[in-house]
């Protein structure tokens, strides 16, 4: 989908051995800054690791998933998008002690129903089956991390500035260790690198005042510019330029420092 949309506007489009889609859009002039902007195409999900029979599969989570919220979630499995549900022992069959404990993935199963074992196999991947919905000014969907970044990067390729050589990296395997971005950076050898991704909104009542101050992002508050995270400390000159550019264009935003990635 991404290749089809960006190819007419790009000077070069290629896919590397890892699966990254690497797009070059050259500016006008010589010796222009080489700016790589990355957004990841992968999403969190699951991998089937054991067939328990009767369409029931044990699975491992892939990426940063809150396992407390998995029971009862609908999923789709494999290239054929086989529908399934994540199930566990019925609540009325559990002991009071069991009800106090958080269910980990080892206690959950993906259930494809009778005959499901003939439709899927160990090694197949699964994702959430959530459908996009509009809720007033907001949208509800799975994988907005990082479909929002991918959408914005597509728009940047289609309306690229002419004063830089734009190196757009639509990457893979971000959710399991930033692997795609590392490979793309070695390929492009950019002078400047920027990642477009999502970040939590800390504007809910269960965050106390101190935590809201530390993580000051919130919905409708504009983009967040990371000062540091668990993998990098941003170049001060680049941060300053981003902040000043946003102010000059009247774009509200936030600066943020985070001790780890996710």
PLM feature spans:
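N-terminal hydrophobic/helix-forming segments and targeting peptides
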Residues: 1-262
């Amino acid at each position: 989908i991404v290749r089809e949309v960006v190819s007419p506007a790009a000077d070069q489009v290629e896919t590397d051995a890892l699966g990254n889609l690497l797009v070059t859009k050259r500016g006008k002039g010589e010796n222009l800054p080489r700016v790589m902007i990355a957004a990841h195409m992968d999403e969190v999900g699951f991998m089937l690791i054991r067939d328990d029979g009767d369409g029931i599969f044990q699975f491992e989570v892939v990426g940063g998933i809150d396992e407390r919220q998995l029971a009862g979630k609908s999923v789709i499995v494999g290239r054929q998008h086989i529908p399934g549900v994540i199930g566990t022992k019925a609540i009325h069959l559990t002991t009071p002690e069991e009800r106090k404990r958080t269910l980990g993935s080892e206690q959950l199963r993906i259930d494809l129903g009778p005959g499901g074992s003939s439709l899927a196999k160990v090694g197949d991947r699964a994702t959430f089956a959530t459908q996009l919905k509009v809720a007033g000014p907001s949208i509800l969907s799975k994988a907005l991390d990082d479909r929002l970044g991918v959408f914005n990067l597509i728009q940047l390729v289609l309306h690229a500035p002419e004063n830089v050589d734009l190196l757009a990296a639509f990457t893979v395997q971000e959710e399991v260790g930033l692997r795609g971005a590392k490979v793309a950076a070695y390929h492009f050898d950019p002078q400047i690198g920027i990642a477009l991704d999502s970040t939590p909104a800390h504007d809910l009542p269960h965050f106390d005042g101190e935590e809201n101050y530390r993580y000051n992002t919130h919905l409708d508050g504009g983009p967040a510019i990371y000062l540091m995270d668990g993998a990098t400390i941003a170049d001060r000159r680049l941060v300053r330029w981003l902040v000043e550019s946003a102010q000059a264009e009247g774009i509200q935003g936030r600066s943020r420092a985070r001790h780890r990635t996710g």
